[in-house]
Amino acid sequence: MGRYFGTDGIRGEANRELTVDKALRLGYALGYYLKNNNPNEEKIKVIMGSDTRISGYMLRSALTAGLTSMGIYIDFVGVIPTPGVAYITKQKKAKAGIMISASHNPAKDNGIKIFNLEGYKLSDEIENQIEDYMDNLDKILANPLAGDKVGKFKYAEDEYFQYKNYLTQCVKGNFKDIKIVLDTANGAAYRAAKDVFLDLRAELVVINDAPNGRNINVKCGSTHPDILSKVVVGYEADLGLAYDGDADRLIAVDKFGNVIDGDKIIGILALGMKNKGTLKNNKVVTTVMSNIGFEKYLKENSIELLRANVGDRYVLEKMLAEDVVIGGEQSGHIILKDYATTGDGVLSSLKLVEVIRDTGKDLHELVSSIKDAPQTLINVKVDNIKKNTWDKNEIIMSFINEANKKYKDEVRILVRKSGTEPLIRVMTEGDDKQLVHKLAEDIAHLIEKELN
């Protein structure tokens, strides 16, 4: 992880951590990088989109100023899911894609994600290079372009339809007579998800689809599925689908209001693909956070689980290295490599409903054979500086090491820093529910005591 980039772009509280100055410097640095790497291109184009946060306008303006001053041309495609930016970037043969979003984070935060010309997130090496440019702007700005050589910003919001139509075409047939509740988190999916499911003739109820700039992810979406659960039961819907702020995550709800996490959705999709002969190598990639019960389910169905570090970029790296077509995270990031270059919540939800339709089984029935082992996850708030050095604390590390030795055959312990928020995440799992929960609480209390 670099000085500015985390596991998913640059992120922080808008106007305090992710400032106008930082966005402007990123615009200069990215523009310089693109110019240097495309010396024979007269007109270098990038695609830019955003979620619904009020601070997106501010950051867009700063990024635009930096990029256009370096001669870059920007097509702004408006409010669109993050994977929509990745898709349009590749289709339009742009040199980069930029998404202004803090994903599932609170409305006060914002972030900037960058994709390369193929629609993949930037490598660590390229991010490091851009960070170097951000810290050495004197050299970059020493010879500014002449006034008639600068780039240009234009609205290209009709390009949204290219992405929307692509999603619709990913489904064979339609979803007639399937009753679905969508929770679009007052975010980037508020238009796309509704449009696609209506195109496919689903019977829809849509909630949290009235963004005002400040209500994104507020008690709604994939991180707060409680209301969705109640609405699904109340409307007697077949299922509910919840996205996060930039719609790269999906969490589902069955007809009884039970929440279905990303791992279980991956399990359902993977088995559906295996039965159709499209699960290449019969392998799935998830992360170290995946429940051992999920791993057992895959094994029973002759599917091998490969684990990657947390973060969809690391999942994708392993998928590419091992030639795997489906992977993702418990949190709902799901990558379907035959269809997309990054996690796409709307695409994943379409494929989930397709499995339900084709098997004739409801979501509750499909998920019932995935039995979770007891697992406890506790998030401990820690400021970003202490978060990055938590594992240097001898008292904390000694306690974790001793617990690992004592309970190595009974409990799996995983403690890690969040790549996107000021949190240390403590996860424990095993067969003894009380022991699993107590260990997680003991570790979390110790971290709280030592670091706060």
Swiss-Prot record:
Key word tRNA processing present: no
The record's InterPro entries line, in alphabetical order, gives: A-D-PHexomutase_a/b/a-I, A-D-PHexomutase_a/b/a-I/II/III, A-D-PHexomutase_a/b/a-II, A-D-PHexomutase_a/b/a-III, A-D-PHexomutase_C, A-D-PHexomutase_C_sf, A-D-PHexomutase_CS, Alpha-D-phosphohexomutase_SF
Does the keyword Repeat feature in the UniProt annotation? no
EC number(s): the record gives: 5.4.2.10
Posttranslational modification: Activated by phosphorylation.
MF-aspect GO terms: magnesium ion binding; phosphoglucosamine mutase activity; phosphomannomutase activity
Residues reported in the UniProt entry to bind Mg(2+)? 103, 244, 246, 248
Q: How is the cofactor bound?
A: Binds 1 Mg(2+) ion per subunit.
Q: Where is the active site?
A: 103 (phosphoserine intermediate)
| Residues modified to Phosphoserine | 103
Q: Name one GO biological process term.
A: carbohydrate metabolic process
Per its UniProt record, the required cofactor names are: Mg(2+)
Alphabetic keyword roster: Isomerase, Magnesium, Metal-binding, Phosphoprotein
Which reaction(s) does the protein catalyse, per the Swiss-Prot or TrEMBL entry?
Answer: alpha-D-glucosamine 1-phosphate = D-glucosamine 6-phosphate
Q: Name one GO cellular component term.
A: cytosol
Top-level enzyme category = isomerase
Question: Which family is annotated?
Answer: Belongs to the phosphohexose mutase family.
Query: PANTHER family annotated for this entry?
Result: PHOSPHOGLUCOMUTASE (ALPHA-D-GLUCOSE-1,6-BISPHOSPHATE-DEPENDENT), PHOSPHOHEXOSE MUTASE
Q: What does this protein do?
A: Catalyzes the conversion of glucosamine-6-phosphate to glucosamine-1-phosphate.
Q: What is this protein called?
A: Phosphoglucosamine mutase
Q: Which organism is it from?
A: Fusobacterium nucleatum subsp. nucleatum (strain ATCC 25586 / DSM 15643 / BCRC 10681 / CIP 101130 / JCM 8532 / KCTC 2640 / LMG 13131 / VPI 4355)
Q: Which gene encodes it?
A: glmM
